[in-house]
Amino acid sequence: MLKPLTTTQAAWVEKTLGNLSLAQAVGQLLCISQFNASRDYWLRLMEQVPFGAARARADSVDEYRTFLAELQTHADIPLLVPANMEHGAAELQGYGTDFPWAMGMGAANDEALMALMGRAIASEARAIGVNWLFNPVIDLNYNFDNPITNIRSLGDNPTQVSRLATAWLQAMQAHGVAATAKHFPGDGVDDRDQHLLTTVNSLPFPQWQETFGLVWQAVIEAGVMCIMPGHISLPDYQGYRAQPQDAPPATLSRTLLIDLLRQELGYQGLIVSDNASMIGLTVHAAAEDLAVESIASGIDIYLNADPEHDFDRLLQGVRDGRIGEDQIYGSARRVLEMKARLNLFEESIGPAPTAAEQILFGDTAQAMADKSITVLRDEEDLQMELVAGAKVLTVTYGQLMPRMGLTDLEIFDEELGERGLQVTHLLNPTSDELRQAAETVDAVFVNLFKIPMMPLGTARMTDTFRNWGWRSLYTRHPNVAYTAFGSPYVAYELPPVTRLIAAYGSSACSQRAAVKVWLGELEAEGTLPVRMPRVEIKALPI
């Protein structure tokens, strides 16, 4: 359960809460996200809206740290500063340690490494002024076609996910940041995307209790400070068994947030909405009503609030009686309590990790990656017999987004080059380009970069994958190695491939580990933390 406040922390909460006007209390419930706004914009906005949390971005980490320090100086009440760091602070480009993605963590299955990773992420986050992390993802990836969870999930075993997630979140919170478990009541069942519609956790409630419910109870008992509901329904609990698609998302459901999460599961911490711009939420009400209805449903902090309008809309909602003042102040109390637990009233930015810590964090990431590599298919010898000077072709198939840190697999090529191999690289080649390049090399490494939400709405191989020509390459070249630098489920779509490993993401440490496995320097010892789909003969329900 939540760690009790110290005497000093409790006194700060009571004093601060007692001095809050209604407008200030409402402001604490807003998280403003403006990634391209100037410093002057933020300072002007702060004079107009007393927001409680801020998400921003800068051209460099040093600029970001300086900006956050200035913002905290101007804030009457310390700000929560959230970030997604699902696989490390390296998600902020050019900074911090890059860990494997969550499914790789599940494949490594090492609680001690999870705890060290939690320490690393927290230390690197606080050093730049981030104090609230939107991780861990504790969704169970039961549906291999789910386009959101995939390698962001630790797996599909509730007991293992509970064990790894609690080690992770407790370590982060012990080192000065608030962890957020997401996405209540649980993603990973539907094959659709809440960016595009409200998705459904269609499990009967007794089965939900034995699976998702077990994980949620575990993180609550472990003391998680924050929970993020998704734009996801749980119709069997909500009373929509006959018409499940009509059930509202958790972000608009007092039945889920109050009756289930708070009363049945006993959660007393902060509840933050998922992104308020997603269609899974916006389809349910007019824009002017969404913030009011979300807060009225039990949300404490409204994520990605409209900075120009939602503050006034919430105040008007109180005046109209749609939200009670008691509820506003109750949510404001929970916001202040989380700030107090983080001691933000004393220090908003932590010390930089020492040189020894930086080495430890990097070694931890590599150890986790080395333990995560999983053999998906080994009908041929995994080790590539290559000598210095051999010519190799590396091929990346995937959708890149450099501004989000999703770049080509350059570390993989560098590692091969450091071992004396002559590397030629192709990105999303056509079949003809691939065949021609493969004719003059000793080996080909085909690297499949398929990660969640790239593109939205599907976890399947699309777009560039359609023209990759893997069939002709497979039959024409005798020495081909396939690596899933993302979804391991690509194995389902590559039945003829006889040599395939999973690295579960493109983190630098995972690229290094994959090279070591292919060249015989490391044994792949990861265990697939999800069930692989199978082709079966079965009748249709017609």
Task: Label each PLM-derived region with a short phrase.
Residues 1-50, 253-254, 263, 284-542:
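Preference for extracellular/luminal or secreted protein segments
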Residues 28-38, 102-116, 197-211, 279-285:
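Active-site mouth loops of central-metabolism enzymes
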Residues 35-48, 113-121, 125, 208-218, ...:
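Short, acidic/polar
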Residues 47-60:
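A short aromatic-anchored loop/beta-hairpin motif
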Residues 53-55, 133-134, 180, 228, ...:
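Conserved beta-strand positions in the central sheet of alpha/beta enzyme cores
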Residues 61-78, 111-127, 333:
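Active-site-adjacent structural elements in enzyme catalytic domains
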Residues 62-79, 83, 89-91, 156-306, ...:
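Second-shell residues forming the walls of enzyme active-site clefts
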Residues 79-87, 134, 331, 479-486:
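Short beta-strand elements of ligand-binding domains
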